[in-house]
Amino acid sequence: GVPINVKCRGSPQCIQPCRDAGMRFGKCMNGKCHCTPQ
């Protein structure tokens, strides 16, 4: 995944930030969102 500068506590929090970044499938890893490119 691609780390983005968004803090998180759970993967559901990353869905929208990843969409906003033009990506999908957000996951929370080490307190930060990681996204999968389209």
From Swiss-Prot:
Expressed by the venom gland. SUPFAM superfamilies: Scorpion toxin-like. Residues 26-33 are annotated as: Interaction with Ca(2+)-activated K(+) channels. Disulfide bonds join 8-28, 14-33, 18-35. Coiled coil: none annotated. Gene3D superfamilies: Knottin, scorpion toxin-like (3.30.30.10). GO terms for molecular function: ion channel inhibitor activity; potassium channel regulator activity; toxin activity. The keyword Secreted applies. It is found in: Secreted. Has the structural arrangement of an alpha-helix connected to antiparallel beta-sheets by disulfide bonds (CS-alpha/beta). Potassium channel inhibitor. Belongs to the short scorpion toxin superfamily. Potassium channel inhibitor family. Alpha-KTx 03 subfamily. This is Potassium channel toxin alpha-KTx 3.8. It comes from Hottentotta tamulus sindicus (Scorpion).
